[in-house]
Amino acid sequence: MAMITRNTATRLPLLLQSQRAVAAASVSHLHTSLPALSPSTSPTSYTRPGPPSTSPPPPGLSKAAEFVISKVDDLMNWARTGSIWPMTFGLACCAVEMMHTGAARYDLDRFGIIFRPSPRQSDCMIVAGTLTNKMAPALRKVYDQMPEPRWVISMGSCANGGGYYHYSYSVVRGCDRIVPVDIYVPGCPPTAEALLYGLLQLQKKINRRKDFLHWWNK
């Protein structure tokens, strides 16, 4: 009996120590960190809208400034449409119809359209007839001498796209390959009424310009 009590007294502390070590080891291996939500499952924050803003609108053109600018553009367009000065560039038989338009029956002067012999005094060029490869550099040089703003009227099938000589080795297939064209007048040759109609269409195009407004917004 004394032996049993002695063995129990010596083994009991060892058993307690081993149990404590096992418990401590099991506790250390427990996952105690809280799970984190992924960004996709996180709740979105809601901000309450504030009162309406009372700040002034961003700076810009006022109604009075827009009115004045539009009236200045209208005045400039009115002056330009009533005083078109074409540079005559007759190259073939279409030039005869261009002369007919300026004669007494149609009288281009009543529209303020006056032919000028110098490109420096002109704001419009009428390319009338067949444009050859040798004449193309001269056409571009005359166009570059015209002051801004400037416009070009292509008169006749040859000036529009080569016309009857479209497949010739020496003909430019359209003067728009050399200079920018604003109005195309079809015909071979076009009548004087057709050229007059093209000039009236050019006046409508000039009347839609907004040069002063574009300059003001820069």
Swiss-Prot record:
Job description of the protein: Core subunit of the mitochondrial membrane respiratory chain NADH dehydrogenase (Complex I) that is believed to belong to the minimal assembly required for catalysis. Complex I functions in the transfer of electrons from NADH to the respiratory chain. The immediate electron acceptor for the enzyme is believed to be ubiquinone.
Subcellular location: Mitochondrion
Family matches, as Pfam families: Oxidored_q6
tRNA processing recorded as keyword: no
Biased composition (Low complexity): 34-48
MF (Gene Ontology): 4 iron, 4 sulfur cluster binding; NADH dehydrogenase (ubiquinone) activity; quinone binding; zinc ion binding
GO cellular component, one term: plasma membrane
Name by which UniProt lists this protein: NADH dehydrogenase [ubiquinone] iron-sulfur protein 7, mitochondrial
Subunit structure: Complex I is composed of at least 49 different subunits. This is a component of the iron-sulfur (IP) fragment of the enzyme.
Cofactors named for this entry: [4Fe-4S] cluster
Keyword Ion transport: no
Composition skew (Pro residues), residue ranges: 49-60
